[in-house]
Amino acid sequence: MIKKGTLKYKWMMITTLIMFSTIILFCLVIIFFLKDTLRDGEIDEAEHSSSEIVNLVESRSMNNITTLDLTAMLENFEKAIIYDRNGKQLMQSSNENMINFKPDIDFVDPETIQISKHNGIPYLIITEPIHSERFEGYSVLIHSLEGYNNVVRSLYFVAIAFGLLATFIMAGISYIFSTQLTKPLVTMSNKMIQIRRDGFQNKLELKTNYEETDNLIDTFNDMMYQIEESFNQQRQFVEDASHELRTPLQIIQGHLNLIQRWGKKDPAVLEESLNISLEEMNRITKLVEELLLLTKDKVNIQALEFEEVNINEEIRSRIKSLKQLHPDYQFKTHLSKKPLTLQINRHQFEQLLLIFIDNAMKYDKDNKQIEIATQLRNKQISIEITDHGLGIPKEDQEFIFDRFYRVDKSRSRSQGGNGLGLFIAEKIVQQYGGYITVDSEVNQYTTFKIIFK
């Protein structure tokens, strides 16, 4: 039993209806032309018989013409009547198929060809005048169209029967074809249900020999891969965020317990525990801000407000502020002499600079020397930030832009890092079609190069 709402049912019904309509229309066109052809044949046959009768009467005298002579000139289901010029019947044919119909003829203005019905049977009537030396009168031929009507009715019957038969055949073919056509979709649906039940580890592996469904399967598998990757990233994000939040909370809890136990009576313990707790709260606040920023890293870039930012001026402004906060650090700049401007959201550009400069300062506690350079080459703007601190091992360089990744977790925590800064920076740069490269030697230097195309 086919359900009415299924694609198979709709496909079968549509194709069957189209084929049925096409066949019926084709049959009607054929019948129309056949009717005209058969009718013309009937008229030609009747006109031929009428001409034979007229020739017979004109070639002989009426006294030498018998009813058998008239009958010999006629085809089946025909009747001939001879009238004089006053409309008086003189003679009529006689055969086995006697036509019991005598039309009323207006001999004053007779119609040459007319059709009349008698007892439901149509007749073709041909009236021709006869002019000869021996006779003046009229010949009336009565030609039955009953056979013609029977043939036409038979044609309609055959057309309907053929249409119905063809419809059933097409319905069967459509059912088989629609079954084969929808089989891959049914299989895909079952596989999808199984994947929903068992998880994303099962991929949809099915070859249908149809380009469209094969493309659909490939697209579905790609989508499943992306969803699986997204779920894994989400799970990893929750785990990493929980871990990053748990550690400072545990530290705060420990010092609060310490204050509760000894801090009330010991001002030194109270002071130390409060300072450490405040530091951890600042760390949590920064982490939460960066986590909130991560939720916005896929915001439509068209929704941001752009302006033409002078890169060199912006770098000088940031360095001036940082020198006031960190007078013990040296900031060396090698800025392009050519003016460098970029259409970018100013807040994002400031954030980008602070991430890399802050990162350089964290991991260069000894030399305290930060170098910043800009240049324009091949219509590409590049910004280089270099520190001479701890450096990044080669094996870690490909992972440093991953979320929550830190080269040395214990040392990173002591520096105040949480592994989100570089991840956020890369997202910002990628929004503007740029990219970031890193070059580093352990205990020598680290250079981050930001390139905007």
Curated annotation (Swiss-Prot):
Domain of life assignment: Bacteria
Protein known as: Signal transduction histidine-protein kinase ArlS
Keywords assigned by UniProt, alphabetized: ATP-binding, Cell membrane, Kinase, Membrane, Nucleotide-binding, Phosphoprotein, Transferase, Transmembrane, Transmembrane helix, Two-component regulatory system
Family matches, as CDD domains: HATPase, HisKA
PTM note: Autophosphorylated.
Domain Histidine kinase: 240-453
SMART domains: HATPase_c (SM00387), HisKA (SM00388)
Name of the coding gene: arlS
Sites bearing Phosphohistidine, chain numbering: H243
Organism lineage: Bacteria, Bacillati, Bacillota, Bacilli, Bacillales
Annotated HAMP domain residues: 179-232
Known catalytic reactions: ATP + protein L-histidine = ADP + protein N-phospho-L-histidine
